[in-house]
Amino acid sequence: MYTADELEQASRIVYAAMPPTPQFAWPLLKDATGCETWVKHENHTPTGAFKVRGGLVHMKMRKDRGETGGVITATRGNHGQSIPFAAARVGITSTIVCPVGNSPEKNAAMRALGAELIETGHDFDAARETAMEIAKDRGLAFIPSFGKELVMGVTTYAHELFRAAGELDAVYVPIGMGSGIVGTIAARDMLGLKTKVIGVSVDGVSDHEKWKRDIEAFGGAAADFPII
């Protein structure tokens, strides 16, 4: 998907805005699981979630390409905090579209980060359709939830984990839109590790199926990994 040099470039962008987050092998988790268990604390990022890494890389690269017009995206929360945080750093305006009834705390955070927030529709798909329509009407750039530069940024968290913890037997990664697990696989492969990467999704895999449709619509292919 990208090269080691591109990952190094992404790392420089991320670390200009935030330090690496910690990872710890917690004794109580070892007692509960019967094995050494590490936790990567992405709650220590400026927005409390790993997705800000991808937003930082994408928005900086947009600015470097001279793409300085406003951006818009659809989200229920973490992606919607990532984009305005990163956009504000490079002087680009951002608009976020979320469903009606979205978390008030997430909405407040997105507004506080400088986004224009539009609440419409009753699910993510409706919000995304509205965001794409607004993008056309206003001449804004629509940012999908998954893309090369977003994944490049996200890969930095897995790269930090593997460099600190070494070759783990397995890593469990939650699946939403897929950037986290794809970034983890990329980091593992770049470091030449044999760690098993296991995706964890909701029962019924509704989010996973939606993720696969989004990847195919974006022009990519879904990675083959186990779902538990």
Positions of the model-derived regions?
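PLP-dependent amino-acid enzyme catalytic core
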Residues: M1-I228
